[in-house]
Amino acid sequence: MGGFTSIWHWVIVLLVIVLLFGAKKIPELAKGLGSGIKNFKKAVKDDEEEAKNELKTLDAQATQTKVHETSEIKSKQES
């Protein structure tokens, strides 16, 4: 009982799907599933790019703050 390793398991699953949805509906379901997967991947990619851009912005802000603090310290020491 190693799961769905037998070809007969897959044949039965496909037969049940055809009986439930009909042969005409299966291409529409596959198209919808493919479209959903494509949209999901695009959303994940967009989120990753947004996170990278945010990280770059935060890093730049931290660098500017550090430079500003360093220049303030130097000006106080010179006074």
UniProtKB/Swiss-Prot annotation:
Gene Ontology BP annotations: protein transport by the Tat complex
Record-annotated membrane-spanning stretches: 1-21
InterPro entries with a match to the protein in the record: TatA/B/E, TatA/E
Compositional bias segments (type: Basic and acidic residues): 66-79
Listed GO MF terms: protein transmembrane transporter activity
Ranges in coiled-coil conformation: none
Region (Disordered): 54-79
Cellular component per GO, a single term: TAT protein transport complex
Compartments (UniProt record): Cell inner membrane
Subunit structure and binding partners: The Tat system comprises two distinct complexes: a TatABC complex, containing multiple copies of TatA, TatB and TatC subunits, and a separate TatA complex, containing only TatA subunits. Substrates initially bind to the TatABC complex, which probably triggers association of the separate TatA complex to form the active translocon.
Its biological purpose: Part of the twin-arginine translocation (Tat) system that transports large folded proteins containing a characteristic twin-arginine motif in their signal peptide across membranes. TatA could form the protein-conducting channel of the Tat system.
Family label: Belongs to the TatA/E family.
UniProt-recorded name of the protein: Sec-independent protein translocase protein TatA
Species of the source: Helicobacter pylori (strain J99 / ATCC 700824)
